[in-house]
Amino acid sequence: MSQANDSILVTPGSGATVATELINGKEYQAVVLADNQGQIHGSLESYYYATPTVAVGASKLYLDIFNATGSGKIMDIRGIWIIPATDVALTGALGVRYDLYRTSAIGTGGTAAAYKSATPDVAGGNINPVDTNNANLPAGITARWLPTGGATIAQWLFATYAPGEETATSMAHITQYQNIVPVLTVGQKLTIRENSGILVKQGTVAATGNTKFLVIFTLE
């Protein structure tokens, strides 16, 4: 990761050298963007967590991601995308409600995520670094598909709905990769500090359909 490492006084004839770019005969100052923690935009090590497909179900626990004490990392959730399956001949009558929670304990049961697997839809889902030069995940950062226990809910954050229809002409086709945390891209990041995590859980109303998820997160 990179952080801004200097500041300069913009005083003609003194100070550090400022990078510029010549455009149409004029020099324009070249800049890089930094966030509120001094991280250079685009420099944080990023990872994907892609899950298998599963049939939806009332109150189903889909996935939890946990950042255990001692990981030495702060996790920022950049997006959680719902991906309804459109290659199954099934028509859903109801939309599916997905709730996002903060958790205070790691999930149990289910299947732990694989790391850099070459198998599509591997059991437990698969975590991949965006850049192969990224460091391996700390042992304290884990993901679990279909946990059956643990994942103690500490806070309800919000809910969203996605269609359950699975034909190519349905709303499920139109809303592929629906991000359920878009409002957080304009303010603070959805930050997961040590000894906390997130959980995606279906609402109490039964529905039909099959779905998977894609989570993108960064570490700092």
What are these regions (language model features)?
Residues 1-132, 136-175, 199-212, 217-220:
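Extended, low-complexity segments enriched in Ser/Thr/Gly and acidic residues that occur primarily
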Residues 168-195:
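Beta-sandwich interaction modules
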